[in-house]
């Protein structure tokens, strides 16, 4: 069978098409309702829930890919776990899973299937993505209320300082969500400025450990650990992360592992139920702060009735 030719398009036309569409979208997103810093599982859930309710949402992600650590379930194994009742989120995403024979209420799914479905659902809902873009600071208003973020291209940070004198730019928003995981970069910046008391970060500073500043290519790189949170305790950590999710500073909501770092909570390791439900609770906190009338977000689904 013969193949019909592709459309006759020049290289310049391809470049203009990319640049025009990207530029128009970026200009449209310079002033938005909610900026979510970090495109891991909690940030993606927050973005999905808000976008489904008509909120203008932009995800700012420093990597070229979304999903954070949700691609793998620990030790380079690509099976992820959630504990009851977080499997309800997998149901919403049509992600298949099985109950483990290790414990009742422990469910296992394929990481790539789960994270790709979550990314698709957030994008389908209308969330916009600015990837390869790094948070560098916050935009502040009266009484240190956060009114946006300062950002730059991720590669700028990777180049030697003597080669890069590249000013960042600022974008405005009604709310900023810190979904940056262990590093809690938005809240860490506010703590550094002395305008927010974060127990976990303060504890790290008092004990002279500080937050993790190792380079991305060094052992102990950001994202692997943080002295802001406590050591692993799965059963306690997940409940507390969801419980403490919400507004942490005027204009700022924290979700996911950023909550553990801010509050000094235990880490939970490779189980993701708290990330998913924290994302839902964070979205509801945003709706409340925005004063939006919308269908409430159920982050504590009831157990199904017995047949």
UniProtKB/Swiss-Prot annotation:
Its EC number is 2.4.2.60. GO terms for molecular function: cysteine-dependent adenosine diphosphate thiazole synthase activity; iron ion binding. Glycine binds at residue 267. GO terms for biological process: thiamine biosynthetic process; thiamine diphosphate biosynthetic process; thiazole biosynthetic process. It comes from the Archaea. It catalyses: [ADP-thiazole synthase]-L-cysteine + glycine + NAD(+) = [ADP-thiazole synthase]-dehydroalanine + ADP-5-ethyl-4-methylthiazole-2-carboxylate + nicotinamide + 3 H2O + 2 H(+). Keywords: Iron, Metal-binding, NAD, Thiamine biosynthesis, Transferase. It holds the Pfam family Thi4. InterPro entries: FAD/NAD-bd_sf, Thi4_prok. The modification 2,3-didehydroalanine (Cys) is found at residue 165. Fe cation binds at residues 167, 182. Residues 202-232 are annotated as: Disordered. Its cofactor is Fe(2+). It is an enzyme of class 2 (transferase). Belongs to the THI4 family. This is Thiamine thiazole synthase. It comes from Haloquadratum walsbyi (strain DSM 16790 / HBSQ001). The gene is thi4.
